Each structure stands twice: as C-alpha cells, then as structure tokens.
C-alpha cells in the first residue's frame, strides 16, 4: 500500500521491512515481521480519535461504491441517465443479485486518478444524478426489488449549472419520494456523508455507517472556518461536531454501525465488502417480514422523529 496516514507511520515502517525481507528471501524475518505488523495494527487502530476516523473515511485507498458493487453484486448491470438531461457519473445505479436476492444498488462514486476523479466530479452529484437515482428507485418499486444505497460524497455539487437545473429541488424531491417508496430500503455510509448530498440517498428503513465513516451537515474544515475563522482547526471541529459512526449511533441518528476489519476497509477491501453484504442480507430478511404499508409508515415515523425540539 502506497498511501499512509500520519498515525500509520509505524505500520509503514514494518511494511517496508517486510518488503525488504522478501527481497532478501528471508522467510523467517517475514514471518516475525508479519506477527509484529498484526500487533502494531491492533495497537494503532484500537483507539482512534474522531479526526483519525475522518482521515480514514477520506483515505484514497478506501473502497468506493463500485468496489463494493464489483465485490458482492452478481450479474450486475448498470443503468444510465435521468431521461431528462444527461447521465451523471457521480451516481452509479446497478441491478443484480446480493445473496441470491435481486437488488437495486445506487451509490455515490468519487473516482480514482485525476482523469476518473474529474469524470466522477470527485463524487459530487449534479441534480441529474439524484434524478437518475430516483428514476431507478422507482423501477425498484415497480418490480418489487429492495434498494441498497451506498453513500460517499463530500456534498452535492454547488456549481452554477447545478443550481440552475434545480439542485435543491432534486434533493428535496428525493427525500419526499424515498420516504414514501413502497419497497425495502437500506442505506450505508461507506466513506463521507456530506450534508444534503448524502441525505438525497439517505432516507431508508435502515441507515448504517461503516465503522470508519463520517456523516455531517458541513465539512470540519468549513465548520472551523465559520466558527473560528481558521480552517486549520478542523481537528477540533471534528471532535465537536459528533460525526463518527459511534457518535451518531449514540445520538440515535443511525440504526447500526458495521464493523470494518481491524486494519480498516482500505487495507482489507474484501473483508469490508463481506461485512457490508452480510449486513444487507440480514437486515433485508427482517424488513421483508413487514407489510409494505407498515414498512413505509415506520420509515416516515423514523424520519419525522429526527431532531430535538423546544416549544
């Protein structure tokens, strides 16, 4: 792995030692170093703070929506376009099988490498992306297919063109439509859950977060710039904002936390994908026991119960 975070320096050193030992052909040293690596990973990842989890949520090697789709979706094929303006590559929509169950998977895709990041607009959808998601979700409702949302975006794209084409309307429309959609919906934050850009595919019967993901109304850098006029105080902001999976579970804003492999999803993509797929399969089995009208009523009540109010 070529991308290491500042708190992973000790892990990087052992990885380099293992690589050198392999070059020398010293199998005994490799065996010892691998044991040391496992111990060091457990030590480093055992007590991560909020800012370190934010760094992991943004890690360039972290699996994106298409990585998960390629891992556990069988016989999947992609659906394109909103049938009104264009296809938005920042949102991907697939139909395939998870655990033998035909499923619609809709995810936000950031992209890797300069060319692909530009194509995917760094995971920031335009309104046509959200309208594509709604179009495909309506197909899921029509054919009685469950939906899996994979949330991973810094936020909805704030460009002039996006605003002119109704970015806020597209997000609001999705909130309304998904709340009333007559099919089971499970949403999982797999990386960054950035504000309205995440909420637009975040209304679900079950909302979960991968252990090292975040969900917030604004980026910590933006929060620090507003509150302290200093974006470099993002670490302080991250702690204050309560944006980690554990924080949001404690606040009852999400339903579940999906544990990642001990060394993080970026170092064990297959393990992370297996955990996510198993969660979807088990939760879907529970949701399918409910009458569809009861399911929708519970979903609406769930959305309306969010927040603290004083009169």
From Swiss-Prot:
A single GO molecular function term of this UniProt record: acetyl-CoA carboxylase activity
UniProt keyword terms in alphabetical order: ATP-binding, Cytoplasm, Fatty acid biosynthesis, Fatty acid metabolism, Lipid biosynthesis, Lipid metabolism, Nucleotide-binding, Transferase
Entry-linked Gene3D superfamilies: 2-enoyl-CoA Hydratase, Chain A, domain 1 (3.90.226.10)
Subcellular localization: Cytoplasm
Entry GO terms, CC: acetyl-CoA carboxylase complex
GO biological process: one example: malonyl-CoA biosynthetic process
Keyword Oxidoreductase (UniProt): no
EC number(s) per entry: 2.1.3.15
Pfam families per UniProt: ACCA (PF03255)
Keyword Hydrolase: no
Occurrences of domain CoA carboxyltransferase C-terminal (ranges): 36-286
Enzyme class: transferase
Catalytic activity line of the entry: N(6)-carboxybiotinyl-L-lysyl-[protein] + acetyl-CoA = N(6)-biotinyl-L-lysyl-[protein] + malonyl-CoA
NCBIfam families per the UniProt record, alphabetical: accA, AccA_sub, PRK05724.1
Function of the protein: Component of the acetyl coenzyme A carboxylase (ACC) complex. First, biotin carboxylase catalyzes the carboxylation of biotin on its carrier protein (BCCP) and then the CO(2) group is transferred by the carboxyltransferase to acetyl-CoA to form malonyl-CoA.
Subunit structure: Acetyl-CoA carboxylase is a heterohexamer composed of biotin carboxyl carrier protein (AccB), biotin carboxylase (AccC) and two subunits each of ACCase subunit alpha (AccA) and ACCase subunit beta (AccD).
Family recorded in the similarity comment: Belongs to the AccA family.
Record PANTHER family: ACETYL-COENZYME A CARBOXYLASE CARBOXYL TRANSFERASE SUBUNIT ALPHA, ACETYL-COENZYME A CARBOXYLASE CARBOXYL TRANSFERASE SUBUNIT ALPHA, CHLOROPLASTIC
Protein name: Acetyl-coenzyme A carboxylase carboxyl transferase subunit alpha
């Amino acid at each position: 792995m070529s991308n290491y975070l500042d708190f992973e320096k000790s892990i990087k050193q052992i990885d380099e030692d293992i690589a050198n030992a392999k070059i020398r052909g010293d199998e005994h040293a490799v065996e010892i170093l691998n044991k040391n690596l496992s111990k060091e990973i457990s030590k480093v990842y055992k007590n991560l703070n909020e800012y370190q989890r934010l760094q992991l949520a943004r890690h360039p090697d972290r699996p994106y929506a298409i990585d998960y789709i390629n891992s556990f979706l069988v016989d999947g094929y992609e659906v394109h376009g909103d049938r009104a303006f264009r296809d938005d590559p920042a949102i991907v929509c697939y139909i395939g099988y998870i655990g033998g169950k035909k499923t619609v998977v809709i995810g936000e895709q950031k992209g890797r490498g300069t060319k692909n990041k530009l194509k995917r607009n760094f995971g920031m959808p335009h309104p046509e992306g959200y309208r594509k998601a709604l179009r495909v979700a309506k197909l899921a409702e029509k054919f009685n297919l469950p939906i899996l949302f994979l949330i991973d975006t810094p936020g909805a794209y704030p460009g002039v063109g996006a605003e002119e084409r109704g970015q806020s309307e597209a997000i609001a429309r999705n909130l309304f439509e998904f709340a009333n959609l007559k099919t089971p919906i499970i949403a999982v934050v797999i990386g960054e859950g950035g504000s309205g850009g995440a909420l637009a595919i975040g209304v679900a019967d079950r909302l979960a977060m991968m252990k090292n993901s975040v969900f917030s109304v604004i980026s910590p850098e933006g929060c620090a710039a507003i509150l302290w006029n200093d974006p470099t105080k993002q670490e302080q902001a991250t702690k204050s904002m309560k944006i980690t999976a554990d924080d949001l579970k404690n606040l009852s804003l999400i339903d579940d936390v999906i544990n990642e492999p001990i060394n993080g999803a970026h170092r064990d993509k297959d393990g992370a994908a297996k955990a996510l797929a198993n969660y979807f399969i088990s939760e879907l089995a529970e949701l399918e026991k409910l009458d569809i009208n009861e399911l929708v009523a519970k979903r609406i009540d769930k959305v309306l119960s969010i927040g603290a109010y004083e009169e």
